[in-house]
Amino acid sequence: MLKTVNLGLQYGSRKLFDKVNIQFDKGNCYGIIGANGAGKSTFLKLLSGEIESTEGEVIKDPKERMSVLRQNQNAFDDQTVIKTVLLGHKRLVEIMNEKEVYYAKESLTDEEGMRLSDLEGEFMELNGWEAESDAATLLNGLGVSDEYHYELMGSLDAKIKIKVLLAQALFGNPDILLLDEPTNNLDYKSTRWLENFLLNFDNTVLIVSHDRHFLNNVCTHICDVDYGKIKLYVGNYEFWYESSQLLLQQQKDQNKKAEQKAKELQEFIARFSANKSKARQATSRKKLLDKLVLTDIEPSSRKYPFIGFKQAREVGNDILIVDNLTKKGLFENLSFTVRKGDKIDFLAENSMIITTLFNILLGKEEADSGSYKWGITTSVSYLMQDNKEFFSDERLDLINWLRQFSPDDQTESFIRGWLGRMLFSGEESMKKSTVLSGGEKVRCILAKMMLESGNVLIMEDPTNHLDLESITALNEGMTSFKGNILFSSHDAELLETVANRIISFEGNGIKDKMTTYEEYLDSLKD
């Protein structure tokens, strides 16, 4: 059991949390959601004791073990991969180390013998004899193969380290599990394995994630962090979204009816209050007016940008022909044709394959051999992860930054309107383009793409850095777009709802199927 009592956190004059009372029970998986900056990760740090609250308290059974997904990738560089996973259970490692000390001695005193016996008993209770085997099972499930298990962490690349730290958090059947963005940098196989692990996990789990598909599959409850309060909903992310939108609409409709009724009553009172024959009715209407109450709709920090892509001209039948394209070390003799209406998701375990392919198609990089040809009616807009080329001029504020990509002779109010649609209002539109966060840069690029009105979109991991609200808006924009899209993503919900064709790089070739993402995953099981 884990709960908070009147929990509060204040930085200067800003209250991040105010009198939060919530309880997390065994057997449930809680998704922590909220706008960027709402305090989701900070809340997990309060629960884990990494930071202290300014008021109230966190209550946890001292007998229960809490495990936290760490983000410190370099903290275990001098440890082997297996040992790093075992370090997820500190007490178990302490016992192992103390046992080694006693077994290294030639003889033991009676007291030391008793101590060793106690350690062996506790070691067995903690399933210590299977510890390395259990650690290996977790690693293999997350895609870290046997060849890495006894390598030093310092010799591994960042993506493998992240998986090892996730295995560390999962190790040893913790009573309470706190996971902050656990699916970041996981491929779809590792993500599906993690989903199955959590679905079969019997203890308490709290997760911060921007992956809607993941939250839908594993969560039994949703904790909505908004303006210092946390509201608890029963159900997964999709149920929360639909029910919260329905409740908000019902409140608005109820208020609209109340306002209309109030207007009618006021008009009657104004017309007949001086009329003796109608005075009693006017007084009655006034009493009704006094009883009318408008529902107080609480303000929310959750804001959805407007994202909608329109084509300046409809594309013809010839979109793109790729013929025997080769880039050594990445792909060879790659050939495919893009047809009108295709929304193609590109999948590859090595993300550099897709990045390089997109750069070649955009003319930013040369292929070693082969060719590609765009149709004469195509106009391409793009969003790539490396977007430094657009944000290097320190002189440009957001108004003048977006003006570069706007139709000629557009007014400042036109530019401000577009920025407002992407949640840059008031003084925010005067920000220098070089100081933007990752998510702000992506929203700016999306505004640029909308203004360009291309009929072909190339998008590399477009949901990276975005909050759930922006991801939802982007998903709707890509789904409703009438042109062609070539994209890559780790967001399963986006893949499932947007893609109608999958091109996956496998071995030395590709698999090209007209299929949905879910059907593609099902085909892998056959």
PLM features per residue range, with description:
Residues 22-26, 179, 277-280, 300-303:
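Short low-complexity stretches enriched in small and charged residues
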